[in-house]
Structure formats: C-alpha cells, structure tokens
Amino acid sequence: MNVTIDISMYPNKEDFIPPIKGFIEKINCYEDLKITTFPTSTVVQGEYNHAMKAVQETIAKCYEEFNMAVYVAKI
C-alpha cells in the first residue's frame, strides 16, 4: 500500500531555517521514496511502512541535532 505524507516542521527557535533544511536533507537520503519540497511543507510518497519509518527516523535525528520542534503531518 502506498501513502502520501504532507509534513511541516516548526522549529522552536528563532533561527528556524537550519533545522528545516536539515530535515529536508535527511529525508532526501532515503531511497525508494518520492520527496517533493514546497515552501511550507514536504511531501513524502512511497510504500506505507517505508515512508512512515523514514519520517519517524528523520524526526528523531532532527530532535537529537536541533532539539524541539512541532511537526504537523497529514497522512
């Protein structure tokens, strides 16, 4: 089963651009996913389990590197 995930990241810091760029760079490292970046969100498309795992791992990596952020995901 394929899925489309539309995800927005809202970093909890004044310098919000580096965490957003970091998220986009990290999610683009996953193979077999179609990633499309828009000004306000990133769309991840692919096989359900693979796409969900990629988003989960990317959020975890960004939390470790950039600390707190709010994520809004539409699945």
Where do the PLM segments sit?
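Charge-rich, low-complexity N-terminal segments
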Residues: 1-75
